[in-house]
């Protein structure tokens, strides 16, 4: 079962990112040194920044929740008799460190973790976190692929294109597309 996540083996032990939290789809947990052995690297950005909705929403719990839910799935699409893991190898690189109340330090952490992936010309799947995690991911892409066009496909109920939140917070969740 080369390149297959452990969820394909019903008797397999599911790797964990940290205690009680499985890797995405049961993929192997990878260190920075192991990134080169994979085509796609998953990373998390568990961040909830400036609250713009009246109360906090739990965005920082997204990485745990997505990973926990993903363990029920794999890469096989029965409608097409297609298994993505016949063609790619993927690993879970864990979460970027986050610093509650400090957008700049958190974004720096996310960008550095993304740099470890993109500097090796690997593809990434990043989940978080509130909308603002888009900013450090795009910064890393731009830095690691200079002169290349970077496209953003944005699915949301609103555009997230405010220049700042109440003229004080340019890194709020309502602002990433303004910087894209």
Enumerate the predicted regions with their spans.
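Conserved alpha-helical scaffold segments that buttress catalytic/binding sites
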Residues: 2-180
């Amino acid at each position: 079962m080369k390149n297959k996540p452990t969820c394909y083996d019903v008797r397999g032990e599911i790797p964990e990112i940290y205690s009680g939290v499985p890797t995405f789809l049961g993929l192997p947990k990878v260190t920075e040194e192991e990134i080169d052995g994979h085509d796609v690297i998953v990373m998390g950005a568990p961040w909830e920044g400036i609250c713009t909705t009246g109360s906090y929403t739990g965005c920082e719990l997204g990485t745990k929740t997505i990973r926990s839910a993903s363990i029920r799935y794999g890469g096989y699409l029965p409608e097409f008799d297609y298994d993505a893991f016949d063609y790619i190898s993927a690993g879970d690189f864990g979460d970027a460190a986050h610093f509650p109340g400090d957008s700049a330090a958190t974004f720096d952490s996310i960008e550095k973790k993304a740099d470890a992936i993109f500097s090796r010309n690997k593809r990434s799947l990043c989940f978080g976190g509130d909308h603002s995690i888009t900013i450090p991911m795009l910064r890393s892409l731009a830095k690691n692929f200079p002169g290349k066009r970077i496209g953003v496909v944005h699915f949301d109920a609103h555009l997230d294109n405010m220049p700042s939140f109440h003229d004080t917070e340019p890194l709020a969740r309502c602002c990433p597309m303004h910087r894209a």
